[in-house]
Amino acid sequence: IDKNLYELAKEAEKLYADEYFEQCMTQTRRLGENICRLILKEKASSADTFDDMIEMLKDKATGSIREKEFIEDLYFLKKAGNASVHSGSVKKDGLTALECLQRSFEACINYAIAKKGPDSKIASLCYDEELLVTGKRGSANKTLKQKYLEKKESAKKSPPKRTKSKD
């Protein structure tokens, strides 16, 4: 939908994979701010801060759950990104960086829906931590049947160990 947003997201994922967690958080903040500007279009001037734009979004919100979550995601990205940039010490905070990636993913989904309108294919996309970390699709994308069959097969290969009873 937007090449610049794609590049920002891709770079944030690379930074995370290389364990540059603070830079990842900063990049997701940039992504969130760019999404905000794109949504507001001409209503946001170059002088408006990220806080100003989040307030504009709050003012024009209709009260839907999707809008509320979108604004919360943007605020989280702003807060985490600012904390990483202005921190006095280096923190290897992989969990916060991972949450930033997840929230930026959600913000991108909401941006796509805002730009193109409701789309069940876009709305059904799921964030996959395992894919991000290992490069392989995680079990989150498997059907219940697939998960069941894998567990069943795994149980056949390694039956539970029995303990000897003491008589």
For each feature predicted by the language model, list its residue ranges.
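Amphipathic alpha-helical interface elements
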Residues: 1-166
